[in-house]
Amino acid sequence: QKTTGLRVQSHLSENPSEVAWVKELVPAAKNYADAYAVFDMFGDKDHPAVMAHCIYSEDEMDLLKEHGVYVAHCPESNLNLSSGIAPVRKFLEEGIAVGLGSDVAGGSSLSMAKALTLAVQVSKMYWRLIDEKSKPLTFAEAFYLATAGGGSYFGKVGTFLDGYEFDAVVARSEERRVGK
């Protein structure tokens, strides 16, 4: 990445079988994230990678933070594939950038409203089933992840604050009707 300036978007620690497979492919790597790092695929804070899922990444957080990696939290896909529940609160507490994603391959909707709702719901399940010290996401936090959290990867977008770029799509409803 440093040579080409091209950024990487991929999956990281989505499910236990994927983690085991990467360990077979790169046995010298300490964990799945290290497999990316040894091949210089995480970039740096100026050219960070985006890694989707990051469900089993608690031992990878230092490496994610060091490289400025953005986490794309895809709650619907994680539910549909029974992958697990991402430790989003822990990412936020560690200062790791998080945005919401839809992962259309494993999800059924591109709706950020749906992703936002599911992010709150699965964070409650994480709190109840995995770590009762990890507070569930609030609506405001999930809204941030769906807007400015993910938008910050692209610069000053994702919010209506002064100094930010307008990055919305305006669709006229009459043009979307079937049969027209």
What are these regions (language model features)?
Residues 1-106:
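Active-site core of metal-dependent hydrolases
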Residues 38-44, 89-177:
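His/Asp/Glu-enriched, well-ordered alpha-helical/loop segment
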